[in-house]
Amino acid sequence: MSLIDIQNLTIKNTSEKSLIKGIDLKIFSQQINALIGESGAGKSLIAKALLEYLPFDLSCTYDSYQFDGENVSRLSQYYGHTIGYISQNYAESFNDHTKLGKQLTAIYRKHYKGSKEEALSKVDKALSWVNLQSKDILNKYSFQLSGGQLERVYIASVLMLEPKLIIADEPVASLDALNGNQVMDLLQHIVLEHGQTLFIITHNLSHVLKYCQYIYVLKEGQIIERGNINHFKYEHLHPYTERLIKYRTQLKRDYYD
């Protein structure tokens, strides 16, 4: 069953050039779904279109758009508590003049009624999920953390709301290999144990082949291949997909040589 089903999604710029060319996309419920492709293929545009985050100079059309079996009219009603978004611009999510503890509890209480103590408990739990301790984070300002720490705080701010769907645009790109794998392990655990759904945009094919159940391959604004993980492991693939995987293998070989 699909949680999101969008048909004939097209994105154009002001010159009427199609950047995304009439794609059909389903995000399957309680699975880790992935969208892969080279830089500039349009992966982030698709994520922003699903969330209605596109810049004003781009237009988006589709034949139908359903979320959890219902036609979508105003997606903003789902933000936070039902749909979480992990973007690449994590540094812009927190201001520099308010301590992170206050900002995180405010985010939680914006979406859920509850006491400050309850919010702090949720914040503490989410920080532990991303291998951070509250005592090291809550009384600090964002500029006092490293980029990797701040990204993990940002991921925690999304996870603590326990959304039904998480759309993640390169969620571990700024993390080292150890913390990146820990975050992916956590996201996998959330999907498997808590029934949540993940749509991840990434160029990390190692993560895709290890964690994902359904995969889309995007090239120049078009989906040129799709299928479950067994298709990508065992079936004959599109030449473009073959090149992506071959390049990944070469990178790993160069790294270990």
Curated annotation (Swiss-Prot):
The complex is composed of two ATP-binding proteins (NikD and NikE), two transmembrane proteins (NikB and NikC) and a solute-binding protein (NikA). Keywords: ATP-binding, Cell membrane, Ion transport, Membrane, Nickel, Nickel transport, Nucleotide-binding, Translocase, Transport. GO terms for molecular function: ABC-type nickel transporter activity; ATP binding; ATP hydrolysis activity; transmembrane transporter activity. The gene is nikD. Induction: Transcription is stable during the exponential phase and increases only in standard conditions in late exponential phase. It catalyses: Ni(2+)(out) + ATP + H2O = Ni(2+)(in) + ADP + phosphate + H(+). PROSITE patterns: ABC_TRANSPORTER_2 (PS50893). GO terms for biological process: transmembrane transport. It is a peripheral membrane protein. GO terms for cellular component: plasma membrane. This is Nickel import system ATP-binding protein NikD. It is found in: Cell membrane. ATP binds at G37, E38, S39, G40, A41, G42, K43, S44. Transmembrane segments: none annotated. It comes from the Bacteria. It comes from Staphylococcus aureus (strain NCTC 8325 / PS 47). Pfam families: ABC_tran. Part of the ABC transporter complex NikABCDE (Opp2) involved in nickel import. Probably responsible for energy coupling to the transport system. Required for full urease activity and plays a significant role in the virulence of S.aureus during urinary tract infection (UTI). InterPro entries: AAA+_ATPase (IPR003593), ABC_Ni/Peptide_Import (IPR050388), ABC_transporter-like_ATP-bd (IPR003439), P-loop_NTPase (IPR027417). Residues 4-245 form the ABC transporter domain. Its EC number is 7.2.2.11. Belongs to the ABC transporter superfamily. Disruption phenotype: Deletion of the nikBCDE operon strongly reduces nickel transport and urease activity. Mutant shows decreased virulence in a mouse model of ascending UTI.
